[in-house]
C-alpha cells in the first residue's frame, strides 16, 4: 500500500526547490487569488521548522511585521508557491527554533554561515 502511495505522489513532487534548513532566511513567492486576478505576494522571514516528508512536507517561516510576530506554514510541494529564494544561510544547533518566539530585537538574530 505504501508503495502505491509513493508512486502516485512521485509525479506531484517539485524538483526545482533550493535546499534550505531551519535558521535560513527565505523569500517565498506565494500565488494569491483575489477575485478573478492572481498575483504574487512575498513573505520573507526565518525558517523555524521543517517537518514531514514526501508530499506532506511543510515548513514554517517567521517574520516580525510592525512589531508583531507572524508565522506562516507552507506545504513544500504546493503549486501555490511560485518560487523560494534563500537569502541567508543561518548557523543554528536545533531543528526546531521555537525559542525565537520569546526573543526580541538583537537577541533574536541568527549567525550567518560564511
Curated annotation (Swiss-Prot):
Q: Which family does it belong to?
A: Belongs to the bacterial ribosomal protein bL19 family.
Q: Read off the PANTHER family from this record.
A: LARGE RIBOSOMAL SUBUNIT PROTEIN BL19M (PTHR15680:SF9), RIBOSOMAL PROTEIN L19 (PTHR15680)
Question: Per the record, GO CC terms?
Answer: cytosolic large ribosomal subunit
Q: Does the keyword Cytoplasm apply?
A: no
A molecular function GO annotation? structural constituent of ribosome
Which controlled-vocabulary keywords does the entry list? Ribonucleoprotein, Ribosomal protein
What is the name of the protein in this document? Large ribosomal subunit protein bL19
Role noted for this protein: This protein is located at the 30S-50S ribosomal subunit interface and may play a role in the structure and function of the aminoacyl-tRNA binding site.
GO annotation, biological process: translation
Q: Which PROSITE patterns match?
A: RIBOSOMAL_L19
- Entries under InterPro entries matching the protein: Ribosomal_bL19 (IPR001857), Ribosomal_bL19_CS (IPR018257), Ribosomal_bL19_sf (IPR038657), Translation_prot_SH3-like_sf (IPR008991)
Per the UniProt record, the source organism is Bacillus mycoides (strain KBAB4) (Bacillus weihenstephanensis)
Amino acid at each position: 500500500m505504501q508503495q502505491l502511495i509513493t508512486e502516485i505522489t512521485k509525479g506531484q513532487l517539485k524538483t526545482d526547490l533550493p535546499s534550505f534548513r531551519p535558521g535560513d532566511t527565505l523569500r517565498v513567492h506565494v500565488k494569491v487569488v483575489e477575485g478573478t486576478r492572481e498575483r504574487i505576494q512575498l513573505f520573507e522571514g526565518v525558517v523555524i521548522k521543517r517537518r514531514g516528508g514526501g508530499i506532506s512536507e511543510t515548513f514554517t517561516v517567521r517574520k516580525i511585521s510592525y512589531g508583531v510576530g507572524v508565522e506562516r506554514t507552507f506545504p513544500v510541494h504546493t503549486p501555490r508557491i511560485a518560487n523560494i529564494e534563500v537569502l541567508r544561510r543561518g548557523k543554528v544547533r536545533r531543528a526546531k527554533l521555537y525559542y525565537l518566539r520569546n526573543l526580541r530585537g538583537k537577541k533574536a538574530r541568527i549567525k550567518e554561515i560564511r
